Each structure stands twice: as C-alpha cells, then as structure tokens.
Design a protein with these regions (language model features):
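ASCE RecA-like P-loop NTPase motor cores
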Residues: 1-176
C-alpha cells in the first residue's frame, strides 16, 4: 500500500486497486486513506458506499478541477466496470485471483477432477485465475487510445511455472 500510495500521488489518483479478499480490501483501503490524507485524492473503498456511487464518482475522475480517485475493490469490480479515458491509468492487483479453495462449489469441482485422476490445480484453479486476471487487467484498457500501467503484486508470477502461464495469457504489453 505504501508503494501504491506513492504512484497514486504521482498520477493524481486515477487508480483501481483490485483485491482478492475482503480482509485485504479493508487493510489496503485503511492504509491508502492514511497515506493520502490531505493530498486531495479521494480514496473510495468498496462497501463504504453503494457500488453505483463508487463507479460514478470514480468515472468523474479529475473533472471540474477535482482531484482524481483511488478505488479499492474486490470481486464485483474485477469485471463489468468500464472507465475509458484518463480517469483510470493504473490498476494494481494484490494477489493472483485463484478461486477460494474452501468454497463448496470449488471443493466439489476439485474432488470431481481428483476422482478422474486429473489435477484440480492445473485444470481448474490456474484456468480460473487466467480468466480473472484477464478481466482485472482489462479494466485498464477499454478503448484503442487508452493506456496505463498494470501492477501485479504477487511474486509467484515470476517464481513458478504457472506464473509464466498467467503472464502469457495477459494482453500484449511491455513488462518491466
């Protein structure tokens, strides 16, 4: 959250932070509010306002001379949230978006694959993470003229074999 706060200041807001858990959402939201206090950048945290209000305020961005916004959100903002133009220039994803292993539906699918002698991780968890990661990254580029930065804060992208699979599934972009 500290590194993100520095980037957010430089951009004047215009940042979407996508989290994989509600605990991370609250923790990151609290730290961002503290770090950005007095900066003129509004920190919006999912759950503090209705979704519609959060989306409208974020899209307003820097209109009318106001400071931009940071939106810290989880699952419901990974897809279906379009912000074309300059209001969004940075998307930060806290961790790889694997399905929650303790979810009853996820458990059932895993057990079914295991019963068939297949790998739930390779055949279910990784493909689901690929789809979610693409959706999260897709929040950044909505039109041909949009550009921005995607930051993935999970070192498993570069330390594991499946991390490479996830990177390859992302839209073409320069990697730093």
């Amino acid at each position: 959250a500290t590194i993100a706060s520095d980037a957010v200041r430089r951009l004047g807001g215009r940042t979407l932070v996508l989290t994989t858990t509600l605990r991370a959402l609250r923790a990151i939201g609290d730290v961002m509010k503290q770090k950005l206090e007095g900066s003129g950048i509004e920190v919006l945290v999912q759950g503090e306002w209705p979704k519609r209000h959060l989306m409208e305020r974020f899209r307003e961005g820097t209109k009318a001379g106001e400071g931009g916004c940071v939106l810290v959100a989880s699952a419901t903002f990974w897809e279906g949230f379009d912000v074309p133009g300059d209001a969004l220039q940075l998307v930060i994803i806290d961790k790889l978006p694997f399905p929650p292993p303790n979810d009853p539906l996820v458990e059932a699918r895993s057990k079914r694959l295991e019963a068939q002698g297949r790998s739930p991780f390779n055949e279910y968890f990784v493909p689901e993470a690929v789809v979610a990661l693409k959706q999260g990254a897709g929040r950044l580029i909505r039109t041909e003229s949009d550009q921005g930065v995607l930051v993935l804060c999970d070192n498993r992208l570069v330390t594991t074999g499946y991390g490479r699979r996830l990177i390859c599934a992302l839209p073409p972009m320069r990697q730093l």
